[in-house]
C-alpha cells in the first residue's frame, strides 16, 4: 500500500479562521501568454460561474526519479530491468508535507473549503471556486474564449500569479493558460481500390499487393511478426480511447474473420473506464480511430490481452482526459506493460509548465516498466495536424523525452509518409540516449531549415511503422485509413509480443523503450527516402540513421528479439 499524506489530517492541522480578512500576500506572475490565433476572447464569464481548478504541487525529487528511470531502462546499466514499484515511485513523486500544508493553508485563509487531493501521489489539489473568487486568488482576469473553428468555449486566462512564498511549492495552476484545440479524429477512411502501386518490394518479400492495401499479413511479412499466440496472461496491452470513439466488437469479429482467419473470431478485448467513459456498441457508434487501434493490436499482437481504456467527457483536467488516464494507470498496482495512444496536441497549446507536468507523469509510469507510445502526429513539421506556420511546430507529446514517438512509412519498400510529424521540442532538451544519433543527423542536414526549429531540443519520432492504406472494418464496412494513428498500435503490438517472450523466459519487460531503441539501431529497418513537408518547406529529409520523419526506422522483429536477449 502506498503511504501518502492524509489531506484530512493536514487540512485540520493547517486550518485557520477564515472569518477575518487574510493579509494580502506578495504575488509573483506564474505564467503568461498571448491568445492563440485559433481562439478568440468572448468576454467575461458571470461572476458566479464555477471553475474547477487544480494546483500541481511540487514533487519531492523528479531529478532523482529521472536518474532511476534511466538506470532501469538503459541496457548497459547494472540496474537494467529492475523497474520500480508504485511505492518506490511515490517516494520521488509525492509532494512534501510542507508543500501540502503551505498551499492548503493559503486556500483556507481565502475561504476555499472543498480542497480535495487528486492524482496517484496526492500531487494535485483540486477545488472549485467562482470566477470572481479565482480572479481574486490568482490576481488575474479569467475570460470566456471560443475555439473559432469548432465553436467550443473555455474559461481561461492569459496570465495568473501565485503568492511569492508559495512559488517553491507550486508547479502550476490548471486549467489557466492552456489553450488546447479540441481533439479530432485523425484517420480518414476510404474504400479500398483494386490495383497496386509501382513500388519496389523489400527484402523480406511482402507481396506487392501490400503497396495498395496493408493488412496484418503484410505487417507479418514486412517486419517478421509471428502469428503464434502469446502465452503470458500477465502481459497486457492498453489502448487509449478519447472523444467518444467506441471500439466495436462486431467490427473486430469481421476484421478477424477477413484478415486473421487463423484466430478465433470471438477473440476480443476488455474495457476500462476513466472519467465515466463508455464503449457503446452499434454500427452508428463505430469510431474509426478506436476500431483502427483495437484491430491493429488484437489483430497483430496475437493472443496478448488487450484493454480498451475509454476516457469519458466527465473530465475537468483541461486536456481532454490526458492527465486523468495517466493518473488512473499510475494508481494501479499492475498497469498494462504497454500503452498506445493515437491522439495528441501541439506543444504550444499546453505551455511549458503543463507540458512538463504531463511529461513527468509519463516518467513515473515508465519507471514502473510501462512502455508508453504515441502517434507522432499527421502535420509533418507543422504539428499534429497540417496548418499554416512560418516556423516548425512540435507536436505534443512528441517532444517529451519519457515516451516513444511513432512516425509513419508507406509502401513495401518503406519510404517516409509525407504527413509523419517530426522535429524538435521547444520545451524539452535533447536527452542523452539520442544525442549521438541526432548530432549525426544535424551535421548532415547543415543549414537546411536553419532558424525554423530548435536544434538542441528533444528530437522525435523515435521509430516508425506502416501508416498508409491500412485496412480496417468500421460500421460493418471495410475501408482504408492513413496516419501515424496506424503506426503506434502496430509498433505497440510488436513490443507486447516481445514482452510476452521476456515474461515467459523469466525476464523483465522492456519498459521505457528509448534507451534500448537507440542502443540497438541494428534492430530496425532504416528508412532513407521521403520527407515531412510543412510551413512552406520540404520539412526534414529521411536519411541513413535516425531522422525526424521515421526515427530509427521500422521494427525487425527477429533483430529486436536478439537485442532483448532472446
Language-model regions, residue ranges each:
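Substrate-binding/charge-relay-adjacent region of secreted/lumenal peptidase catalytic domains
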Residues: 22-117, 126, 131-406, 433-480, ...
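An often Trp-containing, charged/polar helix-loop segment at the C-terminal end
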Residues: 410, 449-452, 495-548, 556
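Fungal secretory targeting signals
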Residues: 1-23, 297
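Short, surface-exposed amphipathic charged segments that create phosphate/polyanion-binding patches used
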Residues: 286-287, 418-423, 541
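Ser/Thr- and Asn-enriched, surface-exposed coil loops between beta-strands
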Residues: 121-123
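C-terminal, well-structured subdomains that either form a transmembrane helix-short loop-helix hairpin
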Residues: 477-494
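Non-catalytic alpha/beta scaffold blocks inside enzyme catalytic domains
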Residues: 400-437
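Penicillin-binding protein/beta-lactamase superfamily catalytic region
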Residues: 484, 548-550
Amino acid at each position: 500500500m502506498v503511504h501518502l499524506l492524509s489531506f484530512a489530517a493536514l487540512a485540520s492541522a493547517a486550518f485557520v479562521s477564515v472569518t477575518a480578512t487574510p493579509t494580502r500576500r506578495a504575488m509573483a506572475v506564474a505564467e503568461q501568454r498571448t491568445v492563440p490565433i485559433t481562439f478568440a476572447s468572448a468576454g467575461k464569464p458571470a461572476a458566479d460561474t464555477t471553475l474547477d481548478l487544480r494546483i500541481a504541487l511540487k514533487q519531492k525529487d523528479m531529478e532523482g526519479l529521472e536518474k532511476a528511470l534511466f538506470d532501469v531502462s538503459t541496457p548497459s546499466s547494472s540496474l537494467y530491468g529492475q523497474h520500480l514499484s508504485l511505492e518506490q515511485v511515490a517516494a520521488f513523486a509525492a509532494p512534501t508535507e510542507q508543500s501540502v500544508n503551505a498551499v492548503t493553508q493559503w486556500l483556507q485563509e481565502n475561504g476555499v473549503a472543498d480542497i480535495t487531493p487528486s492524482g496517484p501521489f496526492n500531487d494535485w489539489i483540486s477545488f472549485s471556486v467562482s470566477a470572481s473568487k479565482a480572479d481574486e486568488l490568482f490576481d488575474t482576469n479569467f475570460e470566456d474564449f471560443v475555439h473559432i473553428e469548432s465553436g467550443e468555449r473555455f474559461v481561461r486566462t492569459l496570465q495568473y500569479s501565485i503568492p511569492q512564498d508559495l512559488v517553491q511549492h507550486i508547479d502550476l495552476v490548471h486549467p489557466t493558460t492552456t489553450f488546447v484545440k479540441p481533439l479530432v479524429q485523425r484517420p480518414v477512411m476510404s474504400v479500398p481500390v483494386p490495383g497496386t502501386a509501382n513500388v519496389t518490394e523489400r527484402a523480406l518479400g511482402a507481396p506487392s499487393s501490400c503497396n495498395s492495401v496493408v493488412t496484418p499479413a503484410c505487417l507479418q511479412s514486412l517486419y517478421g511478426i509471428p502469428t503464434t499466440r502469446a502465452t503470458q496472461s500477465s502481459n497486457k496491452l492498453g489502448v487509449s480511447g478519447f472523444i467518444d470513439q467506441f471500439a466495436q466488437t462486431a467490427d473486430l469479429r469481421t476484421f478477424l474473420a477477413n484478415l486473421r482467419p487463423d484466430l478465433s473470431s470471438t477473440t476480443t478485448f476488455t474495457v476500462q473506464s476513466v472519467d465515466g467513459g463508455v464503449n457503446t456498441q452499434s454500427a452508428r457508434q463505430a469510431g474509426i480511430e478506436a476500431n483502427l487501434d483495437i484491430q491493429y493490436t488484437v489483430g497483430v499482437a496475437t493472443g496478448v490481452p488487450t484493454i480498451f481504456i475509454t476516457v469519458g467527457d466527465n473530465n475537468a483536467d483541461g486536456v481532454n482526459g490526458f492527465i486523468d488516464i495517466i493518473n488512473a494507470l499510475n494508481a494501479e498496482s499492475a498497469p498494462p506493460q504497454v500503452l498506445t495512444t493515437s491522439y495528441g496536441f501541439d506543444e504550444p497549446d499546453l505551455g511549458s509548465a503543463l507540458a512538463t507536468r504531463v511529461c513527468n507523469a509519463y516518467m513515473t509510469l515508465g519507471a514502473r516498466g510501462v512502455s508508453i507510445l504515441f502517434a507522432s502526429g499527421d502535420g509533418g513539421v507543422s504539428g499534429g495536424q497540417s496548418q499554416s506556420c512560418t516556423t516548425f511546430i512540435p507536436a505534443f507529446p512528441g517532444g517529451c523525452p519519457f515516451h516513444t514517438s511513432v512516425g509513419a512509412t508507406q509502401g513495401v519498400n518503406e519510404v517516409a509518409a509525407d504527413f509523419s510529424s517530426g522535429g524538435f521540442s521547444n520545451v524539452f532538451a535533447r536527452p542523452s540516449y539520442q544525442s549521438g544519433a541526432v548530432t549525426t543527423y544535424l551535421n548532415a542536414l547543415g543549414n537546411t531549415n536553419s532558424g525554423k526549429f530548435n536544434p538542441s531540443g528533444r528530437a522525435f519520432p523515435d521509430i516508425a511503422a506502416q501508416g498508409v492504406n491500412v485496412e480496417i472494418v468500421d460500421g460493418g464496412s471495410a475501408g482504408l485509413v492513413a496516419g501515424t494513428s496506424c503506426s503506434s498500435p502496430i509498433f505497440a503490438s510488436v513490443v507486447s509480443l516481445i514482452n510476452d517472450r521476456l515474461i515467459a523466459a523469466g525476464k523483465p519487460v522492456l519498459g521505457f523503450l528509448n534507451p534500448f531503441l537507440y542502443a540497438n539501431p541494428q534492430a530496425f529497418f532504416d528508412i532513407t527516402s521521403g520527407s515531412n513537408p510543412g510551413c512552406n518547406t520540404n520539412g526534414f529529409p529521411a536519411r541513413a540513421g535516425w531522422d525526424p520523419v521515421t526515427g530509427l526506422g521500422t521494427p525487425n522483429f527477429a533483430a529486436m528479439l536478439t537485442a532483448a536477449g532472446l
